[in-house]
A protein has these predicted regions:
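Short coil turns that delineate tetratricopeptide repeat
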Residues: 38-41, 75, 108-109, 141-146, ...
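TPR alpha-solenoid repeat register
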Residues: 45, 80, 113-114, 147-151, ...
Length: 400
């Protein structure tokens, strides 16, 4: 008889739990209330009941009671601890709130839980407790699953000292440093970016380096030559395409002049602007630029920023060959400075059906940056060109 009773009790328990599960899935206030009564040891039932009570405007005491039942049933249910913590904070019980949020962070090491605790410390001006939690959150490193920018922004509200933020909050995790560099550039905080760049280049993987290129571009656009060169050289020291670091005072600086590597389209490498009617293709240590006759009358088709010594005289050397491009068409090298526009040179239009050597003399501007451009300006009285040019063996020499 004892066995029969035990079997019956087991069947009853199974049926009761199955019915409770059915009621839980119905997801109404009434059904989940009954489910929690049938299975009081199920923490998820109590947590969901607390949520529905809140949504239905029920009293705070009933909600907290269900949350307490949830953590009693499962002390590692972080969501319930978080709700208890936030409710305690809302009623001015800061110590109880902190205790609950700390319990949540111990039970669940996910970013959202740590973010909630970091936010609590920020709201209560407890910076010494904020920094370790912020760093723990960022060390998770899964920036594809969450956006760390709000936490970066919180760090800058806690302190405006870039060194403090970098040392106390930003871990040596490549993806996190990459996102932090993106944040600094986007928020116009570039002056704080240089040490971040150095650490990102040191600790990041190849897939993390794109923000360094964007940062370098931003510095070039702002005319901050020295910092742009420093960022670029950090990439070169990392082994970027086998490129040599730039040192305009010691040697002429032109990158990838033999086109042995695909241009990265950033920094001090070649860029091929997107122009309707024009295509660029690297092939056989040459850069081929094709014009289909429908290109704009004025367009830049190949360019590179040069790091030059101020007021020094330079000679650009190159080899080229054209197909179906007439003399005097308006296709030539031009050199620009960010401050004053095009600078004087002895550049001539390019047209030669056989491979030939060309050169352009120019004097560097007062600044350190110049922009070398292969540019088309349709000559009056001519039709738009329909042909191609191959550029190779580009080098820059300083006049001794």
């Amino acid at each position: 008889m004892a066995g029969v009773a035990a079997l019956a009790a087991g069947c009853y328990t199974t049926a009761r739990l199955a019915w409770a599960d059915y009621l839980f899935r119905s997801d109404t206030l009434e059904s989940i209330t009954r489910a929690a009564q049938l299975a009081p040891a199920d923490a998820e039932y109590h947590l969901r009941l607390a949520t529905l009570l809140d949504a239905n405007g029920r009293g705070g005491a009933a909600i907290e009671s269900e949350l307490r039942r949830a953590v009693d049933a499962n002390s590692r249910l972080a969501a319930a601890w978080i709700e208890l913590g936030l409710r305690a904070e809302a009623t001015g019980q800061a110590q109880q709130a902190e205790a609950a949020l700390v319990r949540a962070a111990r039970a669940d090491h996910m970013y959202s839980t740590l973010w909630t605790l970091a936010n609590f410390y920020f709201r209560h001006n407890e910076s010494e407790k904020f920094w370790p939690v912020a760093r723990r959150a960022l060390r998770i490193g899964d920036v594809a699953a969450y956006d760390p920018a709000p936490l970066f922004r919180l760090c800058w509200k806690v302190s405006t000292d870039p060194a403090t933020i970098l040392e106390r909050a930003i871990p040596d995790v490549g993806p996190v440093e990459a996102r932090y560099l993106e944040f600094l550039v986007r928020e116009n905080l570039s002056p704080a970016a240089e040490p971040v760049t150095e650490r990102l280049v040191a600790f990041g993987g190849e897939q993390d380096l794109h923000p360094v290129f964007v940062y370098c571009d931003r510095l070039i656009a702002a005319g901050e030559a020295d910092r742009a060169i420093h960022a670029w050289n950090a990439l070169c020291w990392r082994g970027l395409q086998g490129y040599r670091p730039l040192d305009p005072d010691a040697a002429p600086s032109l990158t990838n002049g033999d086109f042995s590597a695909p241009p990265v389209q950033h920094g001090f490498d070649w860029r091929t602007p997107s122009v309707a009617g024009v295509t660029a293709e690297r092939f056989g240590l040459r850069m081929w630029i094709n014009f289909n006759g429908h290109e704009p009358e004025t367009c830049d088709v190949l360019e590179q920023y040069l790091a030059v010594a101020p007021s020094r005289r330079y000679r650009l050397r190159f080899r080229y060959q054209t197909d179906d491009i007439a003399a005097g068409s308006g296709l030539r090298w031009r050199i620009f400075t960010p401050a004053t526009g095009e600078i004087a040179s002895d550049a001539a239009d390019l047209a030669s059906e056989v491979e030939t050597q060309g050169s352009v003399w120019f004097t560097a501007p007062a600044g350190v940056l110049a922009r070398l451009v292969l540019s088309y300006r349709r000559t009056p009285g001519t039709t738009r060109i329909e042909g191609r040019i191959a550029i190779q063996s580009v080098s820059l020499e300083a006049d001794q």
